[in-house]
């Protein structure tokens, strides 16, 4: 609803629903006016109307991209087949909200720059929340689901921290860092997250369960899936020479340029990402093998139709990672900017060595921590942590009770406090009014029914009486 209202407001005040006029707002120096039709009206209203329309469309995009608190649909949507999740949840459908913000980004910078903080903090909170929930999940699909939410929030934050140009309006080459980082992470995330989802499908196919407790020790049964899953985990953790390294560090660099607070929060979320992904990795491929379950069905590698896509996606992940990592160190530049800007402006990706080293060291520490806790067959440290912080662990496992909050809001507030009075009003007032009209009509009919006796003599008497009465009235007048 918010998205539709935003579109209608946007179209009314701009005179078009097309993106083509947005592209006329060049994301570089010397920008042209963005309105082609009815320019005076739209520009005059731009101080309030256009930012309102953009924020409304952002709310719709936030629901599409599973931003908090509109995220609860995505984990349940993961019940579908993993190839579907790999295609529409990792690469296309769920990132549509981010892409919508990116397509309208010239307008955000020009007319709603003050509202960009909404995008930033919604994304920051969503990224942290989803990463915290992923650390406690035991269902492989749900770990990847909340990982997807967190990574999409990374993209949203990157758009929000994009800095305007020196004139305070149009984005310039320095301010393009967040925009470029967001679109580049959308590109790299599609590869390694699709590989993770397809790998999860191979694992579920092998053990017939989504639960990590049914897994463990699968590396000796599924070597290809093990290798590709490990590479994808390294990519999402942001390790150098894998595709996620450059895009993640670009986002963190843009965050530090916007605010050190945002930068450190997102660095912490990146560390949490490395931790929960390797918690998942060790829980599946290392740890204690479930011999009781495997006695009934020995795990096995999938056919080549299942493993070939994993290998293909991993090759792309590694290839892009090597190219972008070496490009960052050697300052190769590249043409990715012209690929993601509507007018072909070639923005280069900025590489900050200090931030890259810091985030990489933190990611490696997180991986080592996950290795120390979860690699061994026995996991006394993990058990001790669960027993030390049972309420925190349960809250994270229960998604911090967001489902219960929605249940309470819908049943106790919407249904009981809003829907019930409306139903009473409809049943007693609306229906009662029409029932009263029907009852009155029926009573009136019953009262005049004796007049229609079917006796001609009665009709003659009434006719003569009426004629006399009418004559007297006319004579009196």
For every predicted segment, state its role.
Residues 329-342:
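Membrane-proximal cytoplasmic C-terminal regulatory module of class A 7TM GPCRs
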Residues 195-196, 425-438:
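Short, charged cytosolic
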Residues 335, 374-393:
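C-terminal, low-complexity/hydrophilic appendages and adjacent surface loops
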Residues 388-393, 408-426:
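Short, non-transmembrane cytosolic segments of multipass membrane proteins
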Residues 381-386, 407, 433-437:
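A short, ordered amphipathic alpha-helix with a cationic face
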Residues 1-328, 346-379, 394-400, 404, ...:
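...captures the hydrophobic TM-helix bundle architecture rather than a specific catalytic motif
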């Amino acid at each position: 609803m918010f998205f539709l209202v935003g579109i209608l407001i946007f179209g009314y005040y701009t005179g078009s629903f097309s993106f083509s006029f947005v592209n006329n707002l060049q994301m570089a120096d010397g920008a042209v006016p963005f309105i082609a039709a009815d320019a005076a009206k739209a520009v005059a209203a731009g101080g309030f109307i256009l930012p309102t329309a953009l924020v409304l469309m952002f709310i719709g995009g936030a629901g599409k991209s599973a931003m908090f608190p509109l995220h609860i649909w995505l984990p349940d949507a993961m019940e579908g087949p993993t190839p579907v999740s790999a295609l529409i949840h990792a690469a296309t459908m769920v990132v549509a909200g981010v892409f919508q913000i990116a397509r309208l980004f010239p307008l955000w910078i020009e007319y709603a720059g003050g509202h960009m903080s909404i995008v930033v903090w919604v994304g920051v909170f969503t990224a942290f929340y989803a990463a915290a929930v992923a650390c406690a999940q035991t269902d492989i699909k749900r770990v990847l689901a909340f990982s997807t939410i967190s990574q999409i929030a990374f993209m949203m934050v990157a758009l929000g921290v994009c800095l305007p140009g020196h004139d305070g309006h149009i984005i310039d080459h320095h301010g393009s860092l967040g925009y470029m980082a967001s679109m580049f992470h959308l590109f790299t995330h599609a590869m390694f997250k699709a590989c993770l989802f397809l790998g999860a499908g191979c694992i579920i196919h092998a053990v017939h369960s989504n639960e990590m407790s049914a897994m463990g020790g699968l590396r000796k049964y599924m070597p290809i899936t093990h290798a590709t899953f490990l590479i994808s985990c390294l990519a999402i953790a942001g390790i150098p020479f894998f595709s996620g390294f450059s895009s993640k560090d670009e986002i963190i660099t843009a965050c530090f340029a916007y605010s050190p607070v945002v930068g450190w929060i997102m660095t912490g979320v990146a560390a949490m990402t490395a931790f929960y992904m390797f918690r998942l990795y060790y829980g599946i491929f290392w740890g204690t093998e479930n011999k009781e379950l495997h006695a009934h069905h020995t795990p096995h590698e999938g056919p080549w139709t299942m493993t070939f896509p994993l290998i293909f996606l991993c090759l792309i992940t590694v290839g892009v990672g090597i190219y972008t990592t070496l490009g960052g160190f050697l300052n190769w530049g590249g043409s990715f900017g012209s690929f993601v800007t509507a007018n072909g402006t070639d923005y280069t990706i900025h590489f900050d060595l200090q931030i890259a080293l810091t985030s990489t060291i933190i990611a490696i520490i997180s991986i080592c921590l996950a290795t120390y806790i979860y690699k061994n067959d026995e996991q006394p440290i993990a058990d001790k942590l669960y027993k030390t912080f049972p309420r925190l662990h349960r809250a994270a496992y229960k998604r911090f009770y967001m489902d219960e909050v929605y249940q309470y809001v819908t049943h106790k507030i919407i249904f009981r406090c809003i829907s019930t009075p409306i139903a009473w009003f409809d049943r007693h007032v609306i229906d009662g009014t029409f029932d009263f009209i029907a009852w009155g009509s029926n009573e009136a009919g019953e009262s005049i029914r004796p007049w229609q006796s079917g006796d001609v003599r009665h009709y003659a008497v009434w006719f003569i009486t009426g004629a006399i009465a009418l004559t007297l009235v006319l004579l009196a007048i």
